Regions:
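Glycine-rich phosphate/diphosphate-binding loop of Rossmann-like nucleotide-binding domains
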Residues: 6-44, 151-236
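Generic hydrophobic/aromatic pocket-lining and core-packing "Φ" positions
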Residues: 23, 47, 104, 141, ...
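A short helix->loop->beta-strand "cap" motif at the edges of active sites that frequently abuts
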Residues: 31, 86-90, 110-112, 258-261, ...
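Short acidic low-complexity segments
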Residues: 54-67, 217-227
Length: 371
């Protein structure tokens, strides 16, 4: 199979979908890897490293898309990339379709086979979402701490405080991978941290593994509202796999928050769990509503591309190899790869996305028989 790796073109997105080491593995299995020139530059990988790994360097994205049987990406295809996608071509990337009807419809019209990293399940976990969730969770506190500084429009609060000066209050909505990593980072900096979640089992686990400055609270609208007036940094970290994130904080709720408090909504790529959050970029990451600073960058890990690219390839490569070996039709018979299938041959096959837009959903097994 010809596996194509185009350069990412989302604003200030410097990750690449495959390391040279990953290219070596694919080439060793008999596949042909085509990489757009400079695709790995932002992550510190030269064209020569890909050539040494056995890959071919192509001069444009158009060539990569035209030649490849399977496209590997990091972020969802941008409009000009969708225009290059073709019927029967496989695309393996983060799609987050439930947050973007226009992209969903465009891909349905393209007729490509769309396998989403973020919905691939293994024993109840999301192994291809986990590494980027880990990065985003840690970054949410780094970026939130910076946004709390007065020159950034924040309250001028140091997360860890000082001897004789109280630390900041960090409230984390969701105790999954993102929330856990955010809590670890904030606690490590000395903040007082509260994690809200709906799973008692998860909260028992967090109580066991977290330091003493982290507490858990059963999530409810009342519990969230009770914490907002004293919250310095609010991290949105809720996830419903493949579906739009639930809205937990309304615009009206912001009025009870402190002036200069900060919200980092990591769920923004799934629609966001804060009503006032809309996607921003690394170039202009923040905006202010009701006196509250909002950080809503949808590709946070893109700011640390080298770390993120290694983490991504480490997780995705076994599934990339399997998908390249099987092809889309056979892959739909594999439990894990079938869970990643969102669109097959121009038809939607992921219920949460269908529900988000009121579209028809189809059985992946039935679609496989028609290929």
């Amino acid at each position: 199979m010809i596996v194509g790796v185009p350069k990412e073109i989302k604003v200030l997105e410097s990750r690449v979908a495959l390391t040279p080491g990953g290219a070596t593995v694919l080439c060793g299995q008999g596949h042909h890897v085509s990489v757009e020139t400079l695709a790995g530059d932002g992550s510190g990988f030269s064209d020569q490293q890909y050539i040494d790994a056995g890959a071919t360097i192509l001069s444009s994205a158009a060539e990569v898309w035209a030649q490849a049987d399977m496209i590997l990406k990091v972020k969802e295809p941008q409009p000009n990339e969708v225009a290059m996608a073709r019927k029967g071509q496989t695309i393996f990337t983060y799609f987050h379709l439930a947050a973007d009807r226009e992209l969903t419809v465009s891909l349905l019209e393209a007729g490509s086979h769309c396998f989403a990293y973020e919905t691939l399940e293994l024993n109840g976990t999301l192994p291809l979402l986990t590494p980027m969730s880990e990065v985003a969770g840690r970054m949410s506190v780094q970026e939130g701490a910076k946004a709390l500084q007065a020159p950034e429009g924040g309250r001028g609060v140091l997360l860890g405080g000082l001897p004789g000066v109280a630390p900041a209050q960090v409230t984390v909505l969701g105790g999954g991978v993102v929330g856990t990593q955010a809590a670890y980072m904030a606690a490590g900096l000395g903040a007082n941290v509260t994690i809200l979640d709906l799973s008692l089992d998860r909260m028992r686990y967090l109580e066991d593994v977290m330091p003493a400055n982290v507490t858990t609270v059963y999530s409810s609208p009342q519990a969230i509202k009770a914490l907002l007036p004293t919250t310095d940094l609010l991290v949105g970290a809720v996830l419903i796999p493949g579906a739009k994130a639930p809205r937990l904080v309304s615009r009206e709720d912001l009025k009870i928050m402190q002036n200069g408090a900060v919200i980092v909504d990591v769920a923004v790529d799934q629609g966001g769990c804060i009503e006032t959050c809309t996607p921003t970029t690394h170039a202009e990451p923040t905006f202010v509503i009701e006196g509250v600073v909002h950080y809503c960058v949808a590709n946070m890990p893109g700011a640390v591309p080298r770390t993120s690219t290694f983490g991504l390839t480490n997780a995705t490569l076994p599934y990339v190899c399997k998908l390249a070996r099987m092809g889309a039709k056979e892959a739909l018979g594999d439990d894990q790869l079938r869970s990643a299938a969102n669109i097959i041959d121009g038809k939607l096959c992921y219920q949460a996305v269908a529900d988000a837009f009121g579209l028809d959903n189809h059985s992946a097994s039935d679609l496989a028989q028609a290929l």
